[in-house]
Amino acid sequence: MKNSFGSLFSFTTWGESHGPSIGVVIDGCPAGLELHESDFVPAMKRRRPGNPGTSSRKENDIVQILSGVYKGKTTGTPLSLQILNTDVDSSPYENSERLYRPGHSQYTYEKKFGIVDPNGGGRSSARETACRVAAGVVAEKFLANQNIFTLAYLSSLGSLTLPHYLKISPELIHKIHTSPFYSPLPNEKIQEILTSLHDDSDSLGGVISFITSPIHDFLGEPLFGKVHALLASALMSIPAAKGFEIGKGFASAQMRGSQYTDPFVMEGENITLKSNNCGGTLGGITIGVPIEGRIAFKPTSSIKRPCATVTKTKKETTYRTPQTGRHDPCVAIRAVPVVEAMINLVLADLVLYQRCSKL
C-alpha cells in the first residue's frame, strides 16, 4: 500500500478512522522553520467534523509534535505529528462484517489485501485527510517565505454555481474564511440545500475551485513532473475526488486556438499573459500568473436510504446506512482545506526541486 507522497518535501500518513490515533511524518522540511503546535489550530478547525453541514463526529484534532522540532524551529530531521481519535463509535459498522457497503472501498480493499478494517472506512476514510491538512500547514509556512499563497473555496453545490474563477483579494479571503461552508456562495442558500438533503436522507456532490498567488519561480519539471500533472495526482488522491481541470480545462476542447491562446504582453518591465486560459502553466512550468483549477467531488455513498448489495457469502440483499451513522451530506465542504493542503505540499516539493534545477 502506498502511503507516501512527494519527493524532496514528502510525507507519509498513518492510522485508521477508528484507531487510537492518526498521524503524519514529513521528510525534507528544511531546518530553521519556526513551528509550534498552535500553528495547526486554524487549519485543523476548518477541516474537523462537527461544523454546520458536516458529520456530527466531534474531534478536537489537536496536533502533537512528536519529533523534528527543537526550541520552536524545525531541525531538518523527520517531523512527526500525531492526532488522537477521541470520538469513535464503531457500532454502525457491525453489519459491515457480513456484507459490502455500496460505493465504498471495503470490497476492493478486501479482495486486494485479503483483510480490511471496515470501521469508519478504516484507512480509506476521509479521517486520514486530517493528516494531510497538518502536513499542509508546514508546507504553507515554508511557502510563505517564498511569497506563495493558495486559496480554495466551494464554487458549486447543486444549482448554486460560480461560472468563473475569482481573483484573490483581502475581501474574498475574509468572506471564505468566515463562511461556515468556505464559499463565496450565499450561506443561506447552501444551508437550504443541506437541510433538504438531510430531510431526504440523501447527499450531494460539489466543486472546489482554487487559485494561487502569481508564481514567478518557473516551478515544474518537464516532462513527467509538470505542475498540473502533479496537482492532478495530489488532488485526485483525496477521498471522493472524481474530476480535475486546470484553467479552462474541459471547456478548452470546445474553443478555437484564436480564443484559447493566451497572448504575451508587457506589464512594466515584466512579461506576462493577457489572459489565463492555460491556468498558470506553459509546458508544465509556472509562468508568473496564478495557477487556477477545479476539482469535482462525488456525493457520499453513506446515505440513510436502502441500496442493493451482496453479502460476503454472495447473497443479494440491501444495505442502509444506520440512523446512528455520522456522515457528511456534502464531502466537498470539508475538502476545501484538504485541497489547499495538497496544493501547498506539491508546491513546496517543487520549490525544493527548483533549487536543484540549475547552477
UniProtKB/Swiss-Prot annotation:
Cofactors, names only: FMNH2
InterPro entries, per database record: Chorismate_synth, Chorismate_synth_AroC_sf, Chorismate_synthase_CS
Reaction equations catalysed: 5-O-(1-carboxyvinyl)-3-phosphoshikimate = chorismate + phosphate
Molecular function in Gene Ontology: chorismate synthase activity; FMN binding
A single GO cellular-component term on record: cytosol
Pfam family, one: Chorismate_synt
PROSITE patterns per the UniProt record, alphabetical: CHORISMATE_SYNTHASE_1 (PS00787), CHORISMATE_SYNTHASE_2 (PS00788), CHORISMATE_SYNTHASE_3 (PS00789)
Enzyme class, broadest EC rank: lyase
Keywords: Amino-acid biosynthesis, Aromatic amino acid biosynthesis, FAD, Flavoprotein, FMN, Lyase, NADP
Domain of life: Bacteria
Cofactor note: Reduced FMN (FMNH(2)).
Gene Ontology biological process: amino acid biosynthetic process; aromatic amino acid family biosynthetic process; chorismate biosynthetic process
Pathway listed: Metabolic intermediate biosynthesis; chorismate biosynthesis; chorismate from D-erythrose 4-phosphate and phosphoenolpyruvate: step 7/7
Binding-site residues, NADP(+): 47
Enzyme Commission number(s) from the entry: 4.2.3.5
Residue numbers binding FMN: 123-125, 283, 298-302, 326
Protein family: Belongs to the chorismate synthase family.
SUBUNIT field: Homotetramer.
Annotated HAMAP family: Chorismate_synth
Role: This reaction introduces a second double bond into the aromatic ring system.
Protein's name in the database: Chorismate synthase
Lineage: Bacteria, Pseudomonadati, Chlamydiota, Chlamydiia, Chlamydiales
Primary gene name: aroC
